[in-house]
Amino acid sequence: MNMLTEAAVEKALDHKMSNVPYKMIGKDVSVYYGEKRALFDVNLNVRENTVTALIGPSGCGKSTFLRCLNRMNDTIDGCRVTGKITLDTDDVYDPDIDVVELRARVGMVFQKPNPFPKTIYENVSYGPRIHGLAKSKADLDQIVETSLQRAGLWNEVKDRVHESGTGLSGGQQQRLCIARAVAVSPEVILMDEPCSALDPIATAKVEELIHELRENYTIVIVTHSMQQAARVSQRTAMFHLGNLVEENDTDKMFTNPDDPRTQDYIMGRFG
């Protein structure tokens, strides 16, 4: 099974996982939607400046776990989370935590590009404005430009930043959403199948961007594409029926997994 390119294998091997500190720690995380239990005592830690891919069949709990990391599940009626998740030393589910501030520190990029019905500039400047990150118009201009550069979009839109963001192509809209996320200086970026609505060329640009973003951010990505998980991540976690099956270095997961369920899923025997 040769799911990893040679470059990806080298990338994974060169990344010294054992020496990388944890950015987020999940301990005994369970999620309930009303009476239905969706996650069962998941213990999963996210390493700093690392791309962690969450894989598994539809309905396995990977997106549910992802949304726990910045409490997006709070927006779902009847959802209840137990266990503990920490961001550095901060308890994500502490009753006194500022959830708005948490979601600035742990940003989110969704499956379908969802730019605001505003200009490109306003899409990126909105977060810094409400969080008071810019002291002047010049500061705000610089944040917008830097964020668009980090999202690999600046050169494509620098002459039309005051045009609507909804007029961009799908791939450009998704990179605009990434720029919007990084504009508030997050520590972690969550991505829920960010390429599922994109064509192969746009997908390749987003994957290249993920590699670049890892230098400054911790990234957790949910993906149904085994090839994508192999290409972009250093760590991979396999979910099945609400349970964490295993988590390991990506090269090991795709060449010599510990659990036969992981092997069967990667080989396409179920999904």
Curated annotation (Swiss-Prot):
This is Phosphate import ATP-binding protein PstB 1. It comes from Rhizobium johnstonii (strain DSM 114642 / LMG 32736 / 3841) (Rhizobium leguminosarum bv. viciae). The complex is composed of two ATP-binding proteins (PstB), two transmembrane proteins (PstC and PstA) and a solute-binding protein (PstS). Keywords: ATP-binding, Cell inner membrane, Cell membrane, Membrane, Nucleotide-binding, Phosphate transport, Translocase, Transport. The keyword Nucleotide-binding applies. Coiled coil: none annotated. It is a peripheral membrane protein. The gene is pstB1. The keyword Nucleotide-binding applies. Part of the ABC transporter complex PstSACB involved in phosphate import. Responsible for energy coupling to the transport system. It comes from the Bacteria. Residues 24-266 form the ABC transporter domain.
